[in-house]
Amino acid sequence: MKKVPSDLEIAQAHEMIPIAEIAKNIGLGEDDIDLYGKYKAKISLDVLRKFNDRAMGKLIDITAITPTPLGEGKTVTTIGLCQGLGKIGKKVITTLRQPSMGPVFGIKGGAAGGGYSQVVPMEDINIHFTGDIHAVEAANNLLAAMIDTSILLGNPLNIDPMTVMWNRVLDTNDRALRDIVVGLGGKENGYPRQTSFDMAVASEVMAILALAENLHDLRQRLGRIIVAYTYDGKPVTAEDLKAAGAMTVIMKEALKPNLVQTLEGQACIMHAGPFANIAHGNNSVLADKIALNLADYVVTESGFGSDLGMEKFMDIKCRQSGLRPSCVVITCTIRALKMHGGLGNVVAGKPLPEELTRENLPALEKGCANLAHHIKVASYYGVPVVVSINRFTPDTDAEVDLVRKKALEAGALGAYPITVWAEGGEGAIELAEAVVAACEKTADFQLLYPDNLSIKEKIEVLATKVYNADGVVFEPLAERKIKQFEDLGLGHLPICMAKTHLSISHDPAMKGLPKNYIFPIRDIRASVGAGFLYPLAGAMRTMPGLGSKPAAHNVDIDEYGRTVGLF
């Protein structure tokens, strides 16, 4: 049997185009980019002013059904559709989040696609890239250090140490740092207090990077970060600590979007990487706006399912930026739909249960309730919906036909199998043609809720319409926080729900289409710099841990100095 090359082997065998040539192909000159070697570049923010008189392209958002822990190939679909649009002669750019090294060396892997649907240079993208995440880490941790210093040296801002909620961050999965004590060893080491580390991509600084419109906006947003409260209950901000200016300087280069390429030579603007289950889970506004000025079609991706990344794309990113999508593509796999129909227990790092590789039309039909709900959620926003079936070898024609039928019944314009992992853009031509047709339809874009609803009302809209709950229960802590935030004048902010990605509900064990349940809110927090409130539903970890067999075990260099084992 012929050996199937790994993602890394495919990427290493590929002859990349110099990034200056990729830039030229989309209309950028030497003065518009800063080279980071031969195959990576940063794009000057002056490009927005330079091309602001151009007609904007069509924005296509790729989302998904509720995934298994393995993921359903949303990034592969995003890149593959971009390549497919290129195959049919369209001027297209894809915009993606950049990966965090935590998942790269954990179980999930990187975020550069896979097979023949990848962006390159894959190794650089997955490890360090242009240093943006390190800048986020440095800016975040500078603020943390200034908080502890202020408390120790006279506490001029009257900060109550018990209210400090600004954690340090690290771009590594390290569970030992989830619950720690700092400031031990005497007064010269600081004021002892309990705290924790988060993943760098969980930092509000990362969310701010993704939502900032320009350098001035970045500076203002960083200044609005609430880090603690005084003994009198007043918020303390990064501006109060005189930290925001220095943080902005650290983040100045990171604000410039990164330019790389697909395996088939289309431009990819990869920038920012906030988590989708605890933040808003989308690439930067700047990346999308630059791409829309340079291409006729821009294919972007929202994290996890429509209940998380896509909802936040619409209700946070589009609300704040004025972006308007022309089409939504929902990615699904037959294996995941059968799992939602009651078959198998998919566990990250373990082989796929055998029953998910055999034809089972009754289980598939039952699981299609999950797909139908995601189509319904996307339809709330008045945008045409297309379904992409990421096809695997065991999938039968009968199964594909059933999914297509159910997608049409649920209101999608159509459902199209793709084979982009194996065939690149050639495997997405039918989908690409369908998406072009969908983009020609008139979208009647609308947000799910207006700004002037109360905090509770916004949460109730999300719970009943998106999470399919019968209602919401607010725990006492959440009730107190809601009153506090409304008293502070923050009630107008949109909601960024922190919940599991493995279920439409708050409970990862509730597969398919959960119903007849009450959605619980145990706490609510404010990311004022990013511009949203984030309620917590269920247990959420902001610092993952490594498993017994992390991906890091497989990564090494060979005798020629080449990376091996990176997927």
From Swiss-Prot:
What metabolic or biological pathway is this protein involved in?
One-carbon metabolism; tetrahydrofolate interconversion
Q: Which GO terms describe its molecular function?
A: ATP binding; formate-tetrahydrofolate ligase activity
What keywords were assigned to this record?
A: ATP-binding, Ligase, Nucleotide-binding, One-carbon metabolism
Matching Gene3D superfamilies: Domain 2, N(10)-formyltetrahydrofolate synthetase (3.30.1510.10), Formyltetrahydrofolate synthetase, domain 3 (3.10.410.10), P-loop containing nucleotide triphosphate hydrolases (3.40.50.300)
Q: Which GO terms describe its biological process?
A: tetrahydrofolate interconversion
Enzyme Commission number, as recorded: 6.3.4.3
Question: Per its UniProt entry, what is the enzyme's top EC class, as one word?
Answer: ligase
The positions annotated for binding ATP are: T68, P69, L70, G71, E72, G73, K74, T75
Is Ligase among this UniProt entry's keywords? Answer: yes
Pfam families membership:
FTHFS (PF01268)
Catalytic function, reaction form: (6S)-5,6,7,8-tetrahydrofolate + formate + ATP = (6R)-10-formyltetrahydrofolate + ADP + phosphate
Family per similarity comment: Belongs to the formate--tetrahydrofolate ligase family.
Q: Write down the HAMAP family for this protein, in alphabetical order.
A: FTHFS (MF_01543)
What this protein is called in its record is Formate--tetrahydrofolate ligase
Q: Which gene encodes it?
A: fhs
